[in-house]
Amino acid sequence: MATHSNRGRAALVALTLTLLATGAAAPARARDGDSSTVEVRRGTNLAVSLSPDGSTLLMDLQGVLWKLPATGGEGERVTGDLDDPALPSWAPDGERVTLQSYRDGTYDVWTMRPDGGDKRQVTAGPYDDREPVYSPDGTRIAFSSDRGGSYDVWVLELASGRLQRWTDSAAEESQPTWSPDGTEIAFVVGRAPDDPDRAIGELTRLTSRTIEASDERGARRVVVTESAGTIASPSWGPEGDEIAYVVTAPNRSVLKLSGREVTRDEDVFPFRPQWRSATELVYAADGQIRRRDLAGGGAAEIPFSVRLDVTRPAYEQKDRAEDDRRPRPVRGIVSPVLSPDGEQVAFVALGDLWELRIDAAPRQITHDRAVESDPAWSPDGRRLAYSSDREGSSNLYIRDVRSGATRRVTSAPGAEVAAAFSPDGRTLAYQDEQDATFALDLATGESRPLVPAAWEPGAPTWGPGGETVAVAALRPYSNRFREGTSQILAVDAASGEQSWVAPIPFASLSNRVTSGPVWSPDGRAMAFVIASRLWVMDVDAEGRPTGPPRRLTDEVAESPSWGRGSRELLYQSNGRLRIVPAAGGAPRTVPVDLSWRPARAPGRQVIHAGALWDGVRRQLRHDVDIVLRGERIVRVHRHRGGEHGPDVVDASDLTVIPGLWDNHVHQELYRSFLGARQGAQQLAFGVTTTVGVGDPAYQALEDREALAAGRRVGPRFLASGEPVDGSRVYYDFMRPASDQAELERELGRIGALDYDILKTYVRLPYAFQAQAIDFGHRRGLPSFSHYWYPPVAFGQDGISHITATQRLGFSRTQSPGGFAYEDVIRTASASKMAMMSTLFSATTLLADHPELLEDPRVRVLYTPSQLEELQQLAEDARGSEAAAARVGLERSVGILREILRSGGTVLAGTDLPLEPIGVHLHLNLRAMVRYGFTPFEALQTATRIPARQFGASGDLGTVRPGRLADLAFVEGDPLARIEDAANVRMVMTNGRLRTVPSLLAPFADG
C-alpha cells in the first residue's frame, strides 16, 4: 500500500474517530436552531447494494447509509453525518461491506459490518480512491484511484495490504466490477479528445462510451461500446455473459444489459445495478427502489421509508449599521506592494490608487470613476505600473513617481492586467482576458507570448536576468475531476519550456491571487503563502528549489512583496500591513491612516409613481407618492398633487418596484477586466443589491467600501471572501483547509475581515463544514455551499445552485432526468434552507428575446468579449442542443416551484459574471414564469424573499415606510408581464437616483 504522512489531517481524523467511538450513526447536530426529522419515501439519486443472500439492502440516500430488508421497510441508519460514505458493496460472505468515504479529507476505501460497526480504513493518503468492490472470493478489493496521474483500476490484497495496478493508460478508467470467476475486472473508460488549445490546468470533457475488461496481466478487451450518452456503473452478471449498466444523456437515463435497453421512460439513477439472480435486477429509479424481471415480467417497487434530520437555523444576523454615518477604517486594501527601497507602499483602496510612505498618511494618486488594479514598481522605484479602464477598457499605464506624468502603454480592445517589470525595467509582463501571459517591450510597444493560457493563473514574476517567468497555476490530479493543487509553474522566457515546483508535496498555495510566488530582486529566493502562512525558499535561476522552504510567519499572511533589496517582505495579515525580515524575525505593523464614510442621499424627495408594486401585494397600486427623507422611505400614499421642484421625481408614466437582488455573484472575478462597466450593467437592469458568495476577500471589501462611500457606481454589495475549500482546489481564489489548524486560521481571517456571507466549497469535509457553519452563525453570517445533506442537518442557510460541481461526481439534489424527489422537497420545506436558482440554461430563452441583443444597455455597456459571448449564447439557443436544454430548464424550474409552494425558500441568482450580467437575472425570472411560477412569485425571489433571507427585511426588499430607497422604475406591469421587469428606465440606490442614459453616458464612446 502506498503510504503518506497524515500529520496534516490528524485533527480531523481524531475528531471523526471520537464521534465514531460515541456512536457511529449519530447525526451531527447544529449548535443552535430548531431541529426536527422528516420522513421520506422517495429519494434523489439514491443507490442500493444487495446482500449476497438476497435478504438485505444497504441504501445510500442523501449521503447516509441505511439498512433495510430486501422486501422493503423502514431504513435503519448505519452511518453518521460526518462519515460521508457512498457506493457500498458487500463482501461475498455478507459479513462486511466496503465503501468510499471522504471523512479523512480525501476519498479512501473503508470496510465495516453491515450494521455500521467496526469501521476500518484500508487506504489512505493524498489521493482519491473510489468505487470499491469486493472480489468474488472476498480476498481483494478493486477500486479506482488517481494515484497514478489519471484514474486507473487498482486492486488491494486485504491480507497483505499489497496494491496492484490493473490498468495503466492515459485514459480515465473507473467504476470497476469483477467477473464472476474473479479473473477479470470490467470498467468504464473515459477518453478526452486532443485539444491543442486547452489551457494549462483546464480539463477536456471526457467521452465515456466504452466498457473494457482487463485481467491481472493487463490483457484488455472491449466489452461494450455505446454510440451516444455516458456509460456509468457496470455490473457483471452472475453467469459472466451479461453486463448491466446505466447510460445517461441530457434529461434521460436508461438501464441497459449488454447493449439492449431494459427500461423505458424511467429516471434511472446512475449506480451499479444489483443482480438478484441471472434473471432479476434491483436498481433505483424515479425516487424508488425497484426489482425488475429481465424475462419480461416488468418491475415492482421495493418500498422504503427513512427519517432525515433537519435544522432550521436560529441566530441573529449581522447588523450592517445602515444608518451609521461615522467614519470607518478602510479594510479593503488591495494589492499592496512595497517599493524597492522599502520606503513606500502602493495599493488600491476606495476605488483609486494610493501611495503610502511608511509612517506617513496615504496619498491618493488617481481621482476618477475608473477601476485601478495591480500596481507594480519598477526595479529602480521611479515608475509605477498599473491597470485602469479610464479610457474604456483595462489597459496598462506607467506613472513617473516624481513628476506624476502617466502614459498608457497598451491599447488593445480587451483587458491587460497583472503587470510585472523585468529585472532590467525594460519589459512588462502582463496577462490578458484569456489568461495568457505576455512580455511588452516598453521601447517598441511590441508584445510577445511568455506563458500560454492557463486556468486562472496567478500574476507573473520574473527570475534573474529576465530569463524565467513564474506564475501560480492549477495542476489537476486527473482529467476526470477538475480539482488539483495550486503550484508554481516556471517557464523559460525564450524557449517556453515549463517545469512545475511544489514547495511542499501535496500542499497547495493558499490561492492563486494573493499567495505568490514572488521572486526576490536578487533572484535567489521565492516568497509564497501555503497554509495561510508566509514562506521563503531558495531557488536557482530556473526556479528550482535549492533548499527547503522556511516559514516566516505563524500568523495569517498574503500578498507578499519584496523590499530593501531582498531583505524584507511586506504582507497582509487579517487587515493589517506587516513587514518581516526575509531572514526571519518579528514582524512590524505598517499603519494605514485611511477611513471612509457612507455616502448620504439628498434630503427630501418625492417620487410620483404612476404605479407601485410594493413587494408584498399581488397587485399594483396606482398614482402613488413615495416620500423619502435621506436614504429612507417615510411615507407611501395616494398622489396628492401640488409637489413641484428639483426634489420631485416624475415617474408618473412608470411602475416603481423594489430594487432587484442578484443573490449569486462573484463580483470581483472579472472586475479588473470589466472595470467600472460592471456596476453600470447591473444597475441598468434594475439590480440594486448583489450577494457575493465567493471572491478574493480584499477585493470584495474594497468594492463594498467604494460602493458604500459613493466612490463607485453599482448596487449595494453583501460581500464574501474566498470560499473555504479542502485539500484540493479549482478556482484561483479558493482557500484550502486540509487540517484543523488551517481551518481555524481561515475562520479567524473571516472574522477579522468582516464578511457578510460565509461560503464553503466542494472539497471541504463535512466535519470542517459543520464547524464553519457554526462559526458563521455565532458571528451573524449565513453560510452557503454546493451541498444539501447533511448540511441541512447542520443548519446551513442555503445552496448556491439546484445542483453544481460535487466531489462525488454526481448530485444528490437532481437526478439525471432533471428531477428532485421527496427527500429534497420535504427537507427544503422543513428547514427553509434556501436554494438559489442559478439557471444557466435560461440563456436558451434568448431565442425568444432577440431584442435583448440590440438593447442599448447591452450594446453600450458590454465589452467586446461580453458581446461576443452573448451572441454565441443566442446562436446556441437556436442550435441542435437547445431543445434538450429547454427540457432541462423546465424541470429545474419545476424543482424551484415545488420548493417555493411547499413553504421553502428560493432565491434568484445568476453566478455573475459567468452569465450575461444584468440580462441573465431577467432570463431567470422569465424562465420561472414560463414554467409555472406566477410573476408575483418570481419577483419575490429577487426582492422580498432575499431581504428576509439575509436579515435585511427591515431595510430592503419592499417599498414601505422605514425601508431604504432601493428602487427600480420600469415601463409596464411586471405582475402581468414578467418581461416588463427588464424595462428599466431609472434606478435608485440608497436614495440616489440614476437614469439609464446617465449610466450609459460614460461608455457611449466605447
Residue ranges, per PLM feature:
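Short loop/turn segments that connect beta-strands within beta-propeller blades
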Residues: 69-73, 113-117, 157-161, 215-219, ...
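Divalent-metal coordination cores built from histidine and acidic residues
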Residues: 651, 655-656, 660-663, 674-798, ...
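C-terminal cap of metal-dependent C-N hydrolases
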Residues: 280, 562, 948, 964-1005
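Active-site neighborhoods of metal-dependent hydrolases
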Residues: 746-764, 810-931, 997, 1004-1006
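Blade-terminus and WD-like Trp-Asp/Gly-His loop motifs, strongest in beta-propeller folds
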Residues: 49-54, 88-96, 132-140, 176-184, ...
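Histidine-rich, glycine-flanked metal-binding segment
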Residues: 69-75, 618-657
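A flexible loop/linker signature enriched in serine peptidases of the S9 family
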Residues: 42, 60-66, 81-85, 98-110, ...
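Acidic, glycine-enriched loop/beta-strand segments at the rims
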Residues: 613-625, 638, 916-919, 934-939, ...
